[in-house]
UniProtKB/Swiss-Prot annotation:
Positions of the UniProt region annotated as DNA-binding region: 199-365
Record motif Nuclear localization signal, residues: 88-90
Cross-referenced HAMAP family: PPV_E1
Annotated GO CC locations: host cell nucleus
The protein's name in its UniProt record: Replication protein E1
Cross-linked sites for Glycyl lysine isopeptide (Lys-Gly) (interchain with G-Cter in SUMO): 571
Organism: Human papillomavirus 28
Ranges spanned by the short sequence motif Nuclear export signal, renumbered to the chain: 110-119
GO terms assigned for molecular function: ATP binding; ATP hydrolysis activity; DNA binding; DNA helicase activity
Biased composition (Acidic residues): 39-55
Pfam families: PPV_E1_C, PPV_E1_DBD, PPV_E1_N
Mod. after translation: Phosphorylated. Sumoylated.
């Protein structure tokens, strides 16, 4: 420590001597290579502390280091421009000036007016491609991890929790849902493999991430076909809405843990009546294919949430659709794989698989018979095409003819023909009955017995004498000329329409409206009815009746025009009319006075405290009314059906079948 070589002398300050000493020590160490003594090491270790750590760059300006730093920044910016330009060239036309080099683009340089003579100007913005490349399923597919360094994903990761992102489709990792969290699928000691990072462009990573998200379903469909040997769409039918419910669902889940893939075979059983499960391994993990029949109908969202909880897999890694119920190849696939050792089956096989695969069910299939459909429509009194199509389709699971109807390509024609034939049969059946037989026939269709007293009490409430009403009603039903029209007159809200509509509903009549009087066919419904109703006749309507419908009120033969048919001559059925105008008091309609029988409803319609009608007029009460006053109304006595049974068999439009001997 006595060596003072290299110092400036005694006249130097202590600080300058210290600086000189350290300089000498550094020179000696570099020249001779001698290591400092142990006490010097101890002093240096002791001097290392917070007081000697310098965080401020107090170097003099112009020492030359900022030049290298500026050069590095320029080189990095140039590399970034090259990477961004490489990505943009895939999705947008080249601009006139390139950001990489300030030279004009070659196409503009060769022909400056080339852009002006184009028929359609190309947009400068990036466009979404209709068909993506097949190797861009997850954005970065088929990246060889052994041939070169991986890209550093940290700078382009936006939603990860650990700062990592899966860059290889076959690396044994599974990318999570929206957050992008990855989980190690590969075996080993749990340590992450060391990769050499290189600088990556943020814009390129963002575009690749978007491509991966938009092509995710296509990638899953491709992986399914690669593993199972057939397309996923061959087994399913598509539901556009995720809210549509169904009992049967086909689910394919990718990237499942091995333990959970085996455990789902037991976990799914309490929720379903049938489960067909196949488990295969792939580079993403385990792939689980399931055909599940739940105990209750579920929609796609409910199924996805339930399986996501059981399998710990995001919903974006699932393909969920209902199965094809009428596809023979699809049913045969589930049937054959159920017998192999690669599947685990729980529960009873669905009937749509059994029906298309079992020999017995195949032999039971028959051709569609229109007469059976007509018989069904006749028995259930269905003449509306939409109602018949819906109700008959519901029988497909239990009725072979209904199943054949659904398998036919002429369903609309069959429905139309069946309704047409049913209307013909109904019209012919009605035409052969007189009024007494028709009333008895309509009464037999009513279930239960009612009370006739509310009808009488309602008439007395309006001060209508029951005996005169009964006499007029008797001649009305018999169709006696000049007595076949009943008019119910009174102010509003007195129950006129309520009374007439209840009677019309029991007798199966029709309603005609004066609003359609401009048409020549507005009286056509009267051709197919036993009784008619003209509700709320106004003064214009009475003038029309007085001018054109006197014969109809008489109950005589009239001629009715029907659409696309010849004119029909028939006896006009009895007619009920409700009105707020008294036709008997107006001299304009004096010729109608002898043709109508008028009853006045004076009082307001009575209601209970709950808002229900005080007097109930339903089919059961009208049935009891007619049965009670059958003799008073001079209706013909029906045959002794209660003692001798029905004299004729029910109508059948289906041919009889001979018993087949074994």
């Amino acid at each position: 420590m006595d060596d003072t070589s290299g110092t400036e002398g005694d006249e130097c300050s202590e600080l300058e001597r210290a600086g000189g000493w350290f300089m000498v020590e550094a020179i000696v160490d570099r020249r001779t290579g001698d290591k400092p003594s142990s006490d010097e090491d101890e002093d240096e270790d002791a001097d290392e502390g917070e007081d000697f750590v310098d965080f401020i760059d107090d170097r003099p300006v112009g020492d030359g280091q900022e030049v290298a730093q500026e050069l590095l920044l320029q080189q990095a910016a140039a590399d970034d421009d090259v990477a961004v330009q490489a990505v943009k060239r895939k999705f947008a036309p080249s601009p006139y000036f390139s950001p990489v080099c300030m030279q004009p683009s070659i196409e503009n340089e060769l022909s400056p007016r080339l852009d002006a003579i184009k028929l359609g100007r190309q947009s400068g913005t990036a466009k979404r491609r209709l068909f993506q490349l097949p190797d861009s399923g997850y954005g970065q597919t088929q990246v060889d991890t052994e041939s070169g360094p991986l890209q550093v994903q940290d700078i382009c990761e936006t939603g990860t929790q650990d700062g990592r992102q899966d860059a290889d489709e076959g690396s044994g990792r599974n990318v999570g849902g929206n957050g992008g969290q990855e989980e190690e699928r590969a075996g080993g000691d749990g340590e992450e493999s060391q990769t050499q990072g290189v600088q990556t462009d943020k814009a390129a990573c963002g575009v690749l991430a978007i491509l991966r998200a938009s092509n995710q379903k296509a990638t899953l469909l491709g992986k399914f076909k690669e593993q199972f040997g057939l397309g996923f769409n061959e087994l399913i039918r598509h539901f556009k809405s995720s809210k549509t419910v169904c009992l049967d669902w086909v689910v394919c889940v990718f990237g499942v843990y091995c333990t959970l893939a085996e455990g789902i075979k037991t976990l799914i059983q309490p929720q379903c009546d049938y489960a067909h499960i196949q488990v295969l391994s792939c580079q993403w993990g385990m792939t689980v294919l399931m055909l599940v029949r739940y105990k209750r109908a579920k929609n796609r969202e409910t199924v996805a949430k339930g399986l996501s909880t059981l399998l710990n897999v995001p919903e974006s890694h699932m393909l969920i659709e209902p199965p094809k119920l009428r596809s023979g190849p699809a049913a045969l696939y589930w049937y054959k794989t159920a017998m192999s050792n690669c599947s685990d089956v729980y529960g009873e096989t669905p009937e749509w698989i059994v029906r298309q695969t079992m020999v017995g069910h195949a032999l039971e299939e028959a051709q569609f018979s229109l007469s059976e459909m007509v018989q069904y429509a006749y028995d259930h009194d269905i003449t509306d095409e939409s109602m018949l199509a819906f109700e008959y389709a519901l029988l497909a699971d239990t009725d072979a003819n209904a199943a054949a109807f659904l398998s036919s390509n002429c369903q609309a024609k069959y429905v139309k023909d069946a309704c047409t034939m049913c209307r013909h049969y109904k019209r012919g059946e009605q035409a052969r009955m007189n009024m007494s037989e028709w009333i008895w026939f309509r009464g037999d269709k009513v279930q239960g017995d009612g009370d006739w007293k509310p009808i009488v009490q309602f008439l007395r409430y309006h001060d209508v004498e029951f005996i005169p009403f009964l006499c007029a009603f008797k001649t009305f039903l018999q169709g006696i000329p000049k007595k076949s029209c009943l008019v119910f007159y009174g102010p509003a809200d007195t129950g006129k329409s309520y009374f007439c509509m209840s009677l019309l509903r029991f007798l199966g009549g029709v309603v005609i409206s004066y609003a359609n009087s401009n048409s020549h066919f507005w009286l056509q419904p009267l051709a197919d009815a036993k009784i008619g109703l003209l509700d709320d006749a106004t003064s214009q309507c009475w003038c029309y009746i007085d001018t054109y419908l006197r014969n109809a009120l008489d109950g005589n033969q009239v001629c009715i025009d029907r659409k696309h048919r010849a004119l029909l001559q028939l006896k006009c059925p009895p007619l009920l009319i409700t009105t707020n105008i008294n036709p008997l008091e107006d001299d304009r309609w004096k010729y109608l006075r002898s043709r109508v029988q008028l009853f006045t409803f004076k009082n307001k319609f009575p209601l209970t405290t709950q808002g229900e009608p005080l007097y109930t007029l339903n089919d059961q009460n009208w049935k009891c009314f007619f049965r009670r006053l059958w003799a008073r109304l001079s209706l013909t006595d029906p045959d002794d059906e209660e003692e001798n049974g029905n004299p004729s068999e029910p109508f059948r439009c289906v041919p009889g079948q001979n018993a087949r001997t074994l």
